[in-house]
Structures are given as C-alpha cells and as structure tokens.
Curated annotation (Swiss-Prot):
UniProt lineage: Eukaryota, Metazoa, Chordata, Craniata, Vertebrata
PANTHER family in alphabetical order: THREONINE--TRNA LIGASE 1, CYTOPLASMIC, THREONINE-TRNA LIGASE
Subunit structure: Homodimer.
Keywords, comma-separated and alphabetical: Acetylation, Aminoacyl-tRNA synthetase, ATP-binding, Cytoplasm, Disease variant, Ligase, Nucleotide-binding, Phosphoprotein, Protein biosynthesis, RNA-binding, tRNA-binding, Ubl conjugation
Impact when changing residue 392 to E: Partially restores in vitro translation
Disorder association: Trichothiodystrophy 7, non-photosensitive: A form of trichothiodystrophy, a disease characterized by sulfur-deficient brittle hair and multisystem variable abnormalities. The spectrum of clinical features varies from mild disease with only hair involvement to severe disease with cutaneous, neurologic and profound developmental defects. Ichthyosis, intellectual and developmental disabilities, decreased fertility, abnormal characteristics at birth, ocular abnormalities, short stature, and infections are common manifestations.
Superkingdom: Eukaryota
Domain TGS as annotated: residue spans: 79-143
MF (Gene Ontology): ATP binding; identical protein binding; threonine-tRNA ligase activity; tRNA binding; zinc ion binding
Protein name: Threonine--tRNA ligase 1, cytoplasmic
Amino acid sequence: MFEEKASSPSGKMGGEEKPIGAGEEKQKEGGKKKNKEGSGDGGRAELNPWPEYIYTRLEMYNILKAEHDSILAEKAEKDSKPIKVTLPDGKQVDAESWKTTPYQIACGISQGLADNTVIAKVNNVVWDLDRPLEEDCTLELLKFEDEEAQAVYWHSSAHIMGEAMERVYGGCLCYGPPIENGFYYDMYLEEGGVSSNDFSSLEALCKKIIKEKQAFERLEVKKETLLAMFKYNKFKCRILNEKVNTPTTTVYRCGPLIDLCRGPHVRHTGKIKALKIHKNSSTYWEGKADMETLQRIYGISFPDPKMLKEWEKFQEEAKNRDHRKIGRDQELYFFHELSPGSCFFLPKGAYIYNALIEFIRSEYRKRGFQEVVTPNIFNSRLWMTSGHWQHYSENMFSFEVEKELFALKPMNCPGHCLMFDHRPRSWRELPLRLADFGVLHRNELSGALTGLTRVRRFQQDDAHIFCAMEQIEDEIKGCLDFLRTVYSVFGFSFKLNLSTRPEKFLGDIEVWDQAEKQLENSLNEFGEKWELNSGDGAFYGPKIDIQIKDAIGRYHQCATIQLDFQLPIRFNLTYVSHDGDDKKRPVIVHRAILGSVERMIAILTENYGGKWPFWLSPRQVMVVPVGPTCDEYAQKVRQQFHDAKFMADIDLDPGCTLNKKIRNAQLAQYNFILVVGEKEKISGTVNIRTRDNKVHGERTISETIERLQQLKEFRSKQAEEEF
C-alpha cells in the first residue's frame, strides 16, 4: 500500500521465513480451476489456486530480494563502523553501522522491552525494528500507547487484511492506510462485491496469517521495475506514474503480499494479537465520483485481546449514542436525497440550533463582538483575490450569471475583508471584532457525507478580529476565555496545541516570531495545559488547535484560533495608526468556538446520549393530567409554560394510564413532568418530578416558572437536581 501521508522511512525486516511464503507451495499445488465456493459459515472461501499475479509478483520479488541481501551483506562487511546510539535518557549505546538494529539494542536493555516495542524512532523518524542503523543517531522505542506506534501497528494490520483480501477476492488492492481508529483497505473488483457475510472467513484467514508470523520485509526498487511488477494493477501503476517522483521507491512484503509502501511496519504478523473486521462500504478511486468504484473494508487490531473487548464495548455504546439514530428517534432532524448533505431541522431540532446560536450571541454582546450579515453569493474575482479559487474551487458550488462566474461562499473571511475595506479605518476602531452566522456551502463528495458531521450546508459561529500586531496577545486571551466559558457550560474538557511556523511559510520571520511569542504568553496566562506542535502551523500564520473530550472519551476538534498575516496583504487592508501612518497592516484572527453548528449538534447529541440539559432541551416540560376532568386545567398550565418560552407539551391520551404517561415522558427525556389532578386544579399548583424520577412535590405555577427560568438563564447542567 502507498499513501501520501504515510510515515517514513521504511525498513528491512529480519526473522526466518519460507522462501515463497507460508502455505504458498501447498496453495499452488491446488487444482487449476479457481474455487469461489463459500466457506462453511456462509462467507467466501480462499481462492484455489491464488490469482496468477501473486506468483508472478513473488518470482520478481525473490530475484530482487536476493540481489538486495547480497548488496546489504557487502555493505555490512565493507562499510560498517562503530557508531553511538543515544537513548531518551541520554545514555549512549555502542553499535555498528549497517549491522546493529533497533531490535537488538532493545534486547540488550531487556527482552520484555523488545517484545513490547512496536516500532523504533531514529533521529525522530519512525524506523523498522529490524532495519540496520546507518550512523550515529538518537533512538526511541515506541510502545502501542504512542500515537505513531498505533499508526504503524494498524498499517501493518492493513497489510495482513490486504493479503487476505487478495487470497479471497483476487482483485486489485488500492490504498490501505491506518486511520484514527484502525485501518481500511480498498480493492477493485471487476465483478461482484464485498458482503458482511464474508467478514468471518476473512478474519479466520487473517488469524492464520498472524499465526504464521510472516516477516515484514522492506525493499527499495527502481520505478520501472515496479511498473512491471504491478502491471496487473492499473491503480498501483497510476500511483507510480503520478505520485512517485524519485527513481526508486519501496515495497513491503509479508507472506505472498507485496505492496507499494513507505512503511515502516512491525517485525512480523505475529505481533498483531487481536484483529476484527467490522465494516465495509463502497467508495470511488481517490474520492472522485467519475472514477472507478472500489470496495472498502475496515478493521481494528490491538496487542491484547482485552483491548479488543473494550473496543467492542465502546463501539456498542457509541452505536447507542449515534446522533443519526437519536435525531430520528427524538424527531430532531433528517436528511433527504433531494438535497444531500443539507440537514432538515424539525421544530425540536431547530430549537436546539437556535439555542446554541443565542448562547454564542449573548456572549458576543458581553465580549465586544459586532454581528454582521454578509452575502451568500460572490463573484469568483473575490475568491481569486483571497486565493481560495486557486486552491479550493473544486470544493465550491459555482455557476454562471450573466456570463460571469459566481460561487456560494464556503467561508466568511473574504466577505469580512470587504467589510473592513469599504471605508478608511483608524487605529481607534481596533480591535474590530466581526461575527457572522452566515450560511456556508462546501461541495463535499456524496460518499463522504456523514450525518451532521460532514455536510454541504452549514453555519458557523464564525468571527474575525482585525487587530494591530501589539493587540494579538490580549485578543487571544479573550478567545481562550470565551471557549472555556462555552465548553464549561457543555461539560467538555479540552486539549490545547500551539502550531508554529512551518518550513514553507509566507511573510517575515520577525513577524512570525513576535506573533508566536504572544500566543505562548496568552496560553501560559490562560493556565490550562498546552502542547507545542512545532512546524505544524498554516503557511499564513500560527494557530491554536482545541480538541474537546466527550462523555465516552472521544476527542473532537471544533474550536480554532488562527492568525492570518496573508489575507490582509491579499486584500491590501490598511488602517491609519496613531502616529498618522495610513498604510499600517492589520492582523486577522480567525476564531470559532462551536465550529460548524451542525457538527456541534452531532457531538452534543452523542455526548448527552439524547439526554439534553434543561436549557438546551427540546422537551423541557410535559404536563400530565391525572384524568379527563383535569384536561382543561392541564391545557391552561401548558399554555402558561409555553408563554414563558419553555418547550412545553401535554399528554391528553385517554388510552394511557397516569403511570404510563409519566413513563413515556421520562423515556422521551422531558426534563420535568408536571402532574395535575383535582388537588392541583383547586390550589393552582403542579406536582413536579424529573425524568430520573426525582420527586420535587407540589409547587405553584408562578414559583415553578420563576425557578425554571433561573435554571434556563444560568444554563444549569443539572437543573433536575438543582430545582
């Protein structure tokens, strides 16, 4: 497999292995006719014999491997010299270049360490454990808990699954990268497809491959040789022709699988202790709808079967919290094929949407932001000025109007630049904080659309701060305080990362240094823990990335604080400084707290599991009459709560018992259930209980409304308890 974002460099793997691959000779001796019969459990059986390309590929590989081993042996004999390997604690270990491997050094420390190490890191670059060291270097030994080690572990697992897919389906493998939680592999099949019924037989074959402890081997090969090796696979040839710009590149082998890959990988397939195939879908080659349709299979793996059990439990919990399911069950929102990627918010979903916007709007007033309204459609000349047309036009909805090209806006910043520039500006106006809830559109591929998390139509709590260079620190402090206020109301903890100047940046290095220093000062004064992502900033300015943690431990990036030195230059934005200089350039701070309102609703839906806090709940109050004689009073009660701007409903179903009505309201997640009978009717009261069946007893209507208004205004997280 070969991914543009794969880790590098890759490495040669040691370990004993049969010359052709475990089980291969036996497989080749099988009958001439391919057997595609299903396995006993209804899945698909392994092909017998394997596709011819596997044997041809292996023959070429074995010749190249013999040449490679000969060259490496000669290099180890002639060029080897003593080197120093520096460990993280500063200790130095003696080694020999072209001979000593990271695995050998790990064994020298302890066998337990060697066994638990997933991958090495040499001079800050991930490196195969069995690949010889080449010079003096630093060495880290990464375990599965490390994010880079997880990526390698799942990458190797993808190769195991890829081998099984070739042996079962016989198609052409495409991309197969590690992803945030696991891995996938795409395969092109000329006929037929993948079924979830195949998973058990695929998993069984993966377990067999794992049991064989097939070594991962790395080989650097000339591009033209690889074009011959992969001539059966037009997708690999496309990768070689379109993405490989060097005379050579690398392949990895495990068993009969040989694939284009930068690597690195675990030592052998036996390092994967638990593997599960859990999902399949179809996709397009490189996500382009006019290209071939591919079959994608997803998997997950761990170094301990207990971890897989925990993952399965977590998946079940996540499934129960899926915002698409809850949105359906609670009648909040839905999607329709006639407007893909654009959500229909039903009345109760619209309440949540508007409550979030009003929350942010109320904070804007406190914090000196001014809300603006900008057009949805702009001439393409605007996007050419901003630079988005050159880099982002494929993701924009564009159309012709009177022989001019226009587009729906995918972001607000260029429009805000026009707003800043429509008249001369003075230093007295800065910082100028412009906020916009405008509708945005991005042309996401239909196959990538996923509920509310990936949409085409959305709104953001988008704001741009135009400020002087010396004002950056205070503005960033304000942004950080803003996000802490909002996230504490939701009950989210969060992580902060400062991303600094990348290698390819625009602007003056002095300006970058000054801005980064102000960001650091702001973060330090903010008082929350933060980490440095050196070199990970955008080319136009440093940024602070914020990830929130939900109720089941998942992280989501919503908020962003991004400095921009380039957009003011592109739009030639200036202001008159206090010393009379009318060519002073402002800095733009892009910031959002919710990010996409749609995506935040998805996160909140799953975080709360549909059990909304009172202020945000679309079902705040349910009035339940004891019997028909109390229906009229119940309707009056419901109207009073409605007039007080609560989401209040009434259950007048004569076919339900009182207990059934109360239980229905609790299951529907009404925060407060107000029971009214003859006693309450006479006294003008309500009897209050919560969705968790906490009974607060009898209160007057006015007293209840006043208390609920307080809880709503303060956005209490536990209103039912605090009542």
